[in-house]
Design a protein with these regions (language model features):
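Conserved alpha/beta enzyme-core scaffold
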Residues: 1-145
Length: 147
């Protein structure tokens, strides 16, 4: 199979990719540096079209674009598995929650279906010649979404 050709066929813009997100969806952003920077910006641009989108991440390294607008909490709710200082700022704005758990439990939440995920968006490495991507810091649990 020619993975590079298949990848090129599926490749789309961030603005087009985030059109799959609907009001009420759970969107998973991954962890730390895996947060989808470009997709986050595109999703924030759709803010006025959406209500009650629940976004989940952890150890946030930069303020997500979806959290920056004045009325962001009317459209998006941030849910953090583990809080960084940025996650705490989002929660203090009244638009986020902390999900208490131990990191070692995280794969089970996904494996057993306890973490609803309608849309998953994370940054990965470029595809290698075998068609593989690296989940990097999210590999302990994100791979369970695609198996």
């Amino acid at each position: 199979m020619d993975y590079a050709a298949l990848y090129q066929k599926k490749l789309t813009s961030a603005a087009e990719a985030v059109k799959v997100v609907k009001s009420g969806d759970w969107v998973d952003y991954g962890w730390c540096t895996n947060h989808p920077y470009t997709l986050d910006k595109a999703l924030a641009a759709r803010q006025n079209e959406l209500k009650d989108v629940k976004v989940r991440g952890g150890v946030t390294m930069w303020m997500p674009e979806i959290c920056k607008a004045e009325d962001a909490g009317e459209h998006f709710t941030w849910n953090s598995w583990h809080c960084s200082g940025i996650d705490r700022k989002i929660i203090s704005k009244g638009m986020g929650y902390f999900i208490p758990m131990r990191y070692s439990e995280l794969p089970r939440f996904y494996r057993d279906g306890n973490a609803t995920v309608d849309v998953a968006m994370i940054q990965v490495t470029p595809m290698d010649k075998h068609g593989n991507f690296s989940y990097a810091l999210a590999c302990s649990h994100f791979c369970l979404l695609y198996t």
